[in-house]
A protein has these predicted regions:
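Flexible, glycine/small-residue-enriched loop-and-beta-strand segment within the central core
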Residues: 1-8, 18-121, 149, 156-157
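A generic membrane alpha-helix/interface feature
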Residues: 56, 86, 91-92, 138, ...
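C-terminal/domain-terminus segments
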Residues: 120-144
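Conserved beta-strand-loop-alpha-helix hinge in the C-terminal portion
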Residues: 141-166
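Acidic/histidine-enriched, glycine/proline-rich intrinsically disordered or flexible terminal extensions
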Residues: 163-180
Length: 180
């Protein structure tokens, strides 16, 4: 029984790990990248080297993810600013009826679980996007953003270790205060 759908035009780097129930169409995935279960990566999407794409994430056409990026569980990228079912003539839209709004995630960034990243956004190098955030505009390099819409919490001097307790504490405190 087949548990993956990998189109013949997919370009896979060396030592790529692809878990079950994954759909890959016309995309590029760099060396040593891990793709979790129930992930879909559409055509013309690019994922760099040493990335981790966690389960249930959706990476649509026009998304570029550079090297060393972490994508949490259930992250959704959106490439259409004004999605509609039908075109101006009242017919079901086709690929010719819409324009892809690109998304760029720069190297070393981390996007927390359950985030939504809207089209025409750049997430800067080493940025951290807090879990559950909705990113509607560009995120500066070395920034921590969180919320709906995501807003700047603070910047961090990089390089930092992925287990930087100060960065995690700042993000935790922000999210905790949002609930109260």
């Amino acid at each position: 029984m087949e548990f993956q759908s990998i189109a013949p035009d997919v370009k896979l780097g060396e030592n790529v790990t692809i878990h079950k129930f994954v759909n890959l169409y016309g995309c590029e995935i760099g060396d040593h990248t891990k793709i979790g279960v129930f992930v879909e990566v559409q055509k013309n999407a690019k994922i760099g080297k040493n990335c981790k794409i966690s389960s249930h994430s959706f990476i649509c056409e026009g998304v570029t993810i550079e090297d060393n990026v972490f994508i949490g569980h259930s992250v959704v990228f959106i490439n259409d600013t004004y999605p509609r079912a039908t075109n101006g003539q009242g017919r079901l839209q086709t690929e010719e009826d819409w324009k892809v709004e690109p998304v760029l995630v720069k190297r070393g960034s981390s996007i927390g679980s359950n985030c939504t990243i809207l089209g025409h956004v750049t997430i800067g190098e080493n940025a951290i996007v807090g879990a559950g955030s909705v990113v509607t505009r560009d995120v500066p390099p070395n920034a921590i953003v969180a919320g709906n819409p995501a807003r700047l919490i603070r910047t961090i001097d990089f390089p930092t270790h992925p287990e930087d307790k100060e960065a995690r504490y700042v993000l935790y405190e922000f999210l905790r205060n949002q609930r109260s």
